Design a protein with these regions (language model features):
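N-terminal cationic and glycine-rich segments that engage phosphates or anionic surfaces
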Residues: 1-66, 72-73, 77-120, 131-134, ...
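Residue-level signature of catalytic and energy-coupling elements of molecular machines
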Residues: 13, 69, 161, 213
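A generic "alpha-helical surface" signal
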Residues: 48, 135, 208-212
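Short His-Asn-centered micro-motif
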Residues: 70-73, 163-165
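Glycine-/small-residue-rich active-site loops that bind phosphorylated ligands and cofactors
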Residues: 75-76, 168, 205
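Long, charge-patterned amphipathic alpha-helical coiled-coil/hairpin "stalk" segments used as oligomerization
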Residues: 87, 92-194
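Short glycine/threonine-rich loop/turn motifs
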Residues: 171-226
Length: 237
């Protein structure tokens, strides 16, 4: 797992924060300077936090536990959903339903309903319903798939969540905190880094910044999964 270089972080615009008037003073330790009214993030601190977060995520993945990816802002959705799929981890990129984790039993019931509808449509077991009812079912399944598709295979609460933009995803942050689930997050200059366990100071609005940080998180998870698989094979022999 190779950490991005200073120049790579710079090229990805990771250092660009928000206007000074929007800053959160608790981000002071991660800010390098102010330039033309905009706070610039200290990329050396970003690199330190990245490495710390990566090592922790690697160990979680190595232990066989699930890590949920959360990013519902438009510029992050595709990046994060593809990243999560690449390591077979759950994700939420459309809308965070209240109680996604704190009311997990209800969410599982909704997922079960979605899967039942999908099975029924796939099997063609729809002879007893009208075309209008069939259309309604199809639309309901599509709507549920958009919101719940990323957690369809999540049978227990995740052990950690990786979040892009903790202001936007404050519900996810709050639920994770209430349940004692470890939080890893990209934290911009307008946010409170103390709200998460592993803050990564970074521009959470730029797609390039989101991609480079998310990619490193995925590489850490992949490394953990590979080490886990190697240990399982060794034990089997």
């Amino acid at each position: 797992m190779e950490k991005p270089s200073y120049n790579q972080l710079l090229d990805a615009n990771v250092h660009f924060g928000h206007l000074r008037k929007k800053w959160n003073p608790k981000m002071r330790q991660y800010i390098f300077k102010e330039h033309k009214g905009v706070h610039l993030i200290d990329l050396n601190r970003t690199a330190e936090c990245l490495e710390k977060a990566g090592q922790a995520l690697k160990q979680i993945a190595k232990s066989g536990k699930k890590i949920m990816f959360v990013a519902t802002k438009k510029q992050a959705r595709d990046i994060v959903s593809e990243a999560a799929r690449s390591v077979n981890m759950p994700f939420v990129t459309e809308r965070w339903l209240g109680g996604m984790m704190t009311n997990f039993t209800t969410i599982r019931r909704s997922v079960k309903k979605m899967n039942n509808i999908e099975r029924m449509l796939a099997d063609g077991n729809v002879t007893n319903i009208t075309k209008k009812q069939l259309l309604t079912l199809s639309r309901e399944r599509e709507k549920m798939e958009r919101v719940l598709g990323g957690v369809a295979n999540l049978n227990r609460l995740p052990s950690a969540v990786f979040i892009v933009d903790i202001l936007n995803e404050h519900l996810a942050v709050d639920e994770a905190d209430r349940l004692g689930i470890r939080t890893f997050a990209m934290v911009d200059t307008n946010s409170d880094p103390n709200l998460v366990d592993f803050p990564i100071p970074a521009n959470d609005d730029s797609s390039k910044s989101i991609e480079i940080i998310t990619r490193y998180m995925v590489e850490a998870i992949k490394e953990g999964l590979e080490e886990r698989n190697a240990e399982v094979k060794e034990e089997a022999n």
